[in-house]
């Protein structure tokens, strides 16, 4: 601006011609832009350096769970047996004096379903975390077909487990690719079959591009129930020996829940299933239901046995039945 004003005065006083002023301004512009670009470049380099430091720190992290004691000869075929928990005590590493699990013991044979229920913080997810080997330091052992899971190579163990949390991650790609994420060499028919088992197929067919419909970052364009059913379809397509549903049916309605669980019983007749839930209808058909309180098993049995015991499970069942009935009356 100063250049233009002062240059204008020089032109008015006939010290410079208009052509000379225009040329001068053009030269100044050509000189100033590279200076701005250099400043911008230094800013980008500083930001890049800070990002690189964070990435380098992450890459330098040493995993706490390793295969140091694993038997390399164990294969997935060696894990087709019963799952047995014998946990005397477990505490999180940052609070070693506060046990969160105590005397957790149960056995599941292939084809059986386990239900885990209890209040928030009772220890349901912690039991699952130990099977996934998120923590290895505990008093006791968990065995799969007689083999301590800490002696099974991580890759082999996790290949036999499908885990569906309450809020699973979905990629910003198509529905079909999201379902097929954890499975190799699957075709469209396999994907559709898995979607049918999770009661998602009909919803997908109503979408503009079917299984090619983009879901957005973390399933932004889908409802909570659709996201959960897509995650279940992904797990069913993997067809692992052990399926874990960690409150993974919380966003679906009762009718859809019933259809999904019915499909699971048919498809997984010879495989193990673990269901952690707050809604008791999710576990009512389980072979074994464990009621947890403060990390301990306070009730165990099947649905009918727990109702007959008239403890926490029976009280919660009556309460949830009443809530469901009130909801139905309100809808009417």
Task: Cite the ranges covered by each PLM segment.
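Pre-NBD coupling/linker segments of ABC/ABC-like ATPases
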Residues: 63-78, 306
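Hydrophobic/aromatic residues in alpha-helical transmembrane segments
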Residues: 3-7, 34, 51, 200
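A hydrophobic transmembrane-helix motif
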Residues: 1-22
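ABC-type nucleotide-binding domain
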Residues: 76-332
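Small-residue-enriched core segments of transmembrane alpha-helices in multipass membrane transport
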Residues: 23-32
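Cytosolic ends of transmembrane helices, especially the final helix of ABC transmembrane type-1 domains
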Residues: 31-58
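Conserved E/DxxT/N motif and adjacent residues on the DHp alpha2 helix
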Residues: 57, 64, 180
